[in-house]
Amino acid sequence: MKVLLIQDVEHLGTAGDIKEVSGGYGRNYLLPKKLAVFATPGLIKQAEERLAKQRKLEAKQREELRGLADSINGVTLKFVTKVGEQDRLYGSVTSSDIAEKLQAAIGQEVDRRKIQLDEPIKRTGVYSIGVRLLAGLEPHINVVVEGENGEGSVQPAAEAAEVASTEA
């Protein structure tokens, strides 16, 4: 029996998929729980058209994101903040701060959740941070954090992490 899934069904498929299932499974489980409907030729045709349209839309979005990745890759953002002892910042630089500066730099909005920052930056230095747009599409930006009036030494992120681990 062919059915068109209305909702995602674990171990079977996602909504919109057309699946071949046993008659008992379809009649006794999928149909009564409104998880699927009989796959008539008209429904199959509609599902295929919807799937083709969805693939076309995804391809277009992927191309737009590739263009965005090209504009993001290698951008350097500079943050100037107050610095205390041992190059520690008063406050921190968060993914939201980076997203705002990145939007100002490239003119397009980037969701802060896509910025791969494990924890806020709390020391001066140069950091390389990934922006995950899609699986396999992750451009990197450089973030430079300096103290006001040239306070604090700007060192690569690896050295900053090493200094932080020795002090902890």
UniProtKB/Swiss-Prot annotation:
Entry-linked Gene3D superfamilies: Ribosomal protein L9, C-terminal domain, Ribosomal protein L9, N-terminal domain
Annotated Gene Ontology cellular component terms: ribonucleoprotein complex; ribosome
Region (Disordered): 148-168
Ranges in a coiled coil: none
Superkingdom, natural source: Bacteria
BP-aspect Gene Ontology terms: translation
Keywords: Ribonucleoprotein, Ribosomal protein, RNA-binding, rRNA-binding
GO terms of molecular function: rRNA binding; structural constituent of ribosome
Matches recorded under InterPro entries: Ribosomal_bL9, Ribosomal_bL9/RNase_H1_N, Ribosomal_bL9_bac/chp, Ribosomal_bL9_C, Ribosomal_bL9_C_sf, Ribosomal_bL9_N, Ribosomal_bL9_N_sf
Pfam families on file: Ribosomal_L9_C (PF03948), Ribosomal_L9_N (PF01281)
UniProt biased composition (Low complexity): 157-168
PANTHER family the record matches: 50S RIBOSOMAL PROTEIN L9
Official protein name in the record: Large ribosomal subunit protein bL9
Originating species: Herpetosiphon aurantiacus (strain ATCC 23779 / DSM 785 / 114-95)
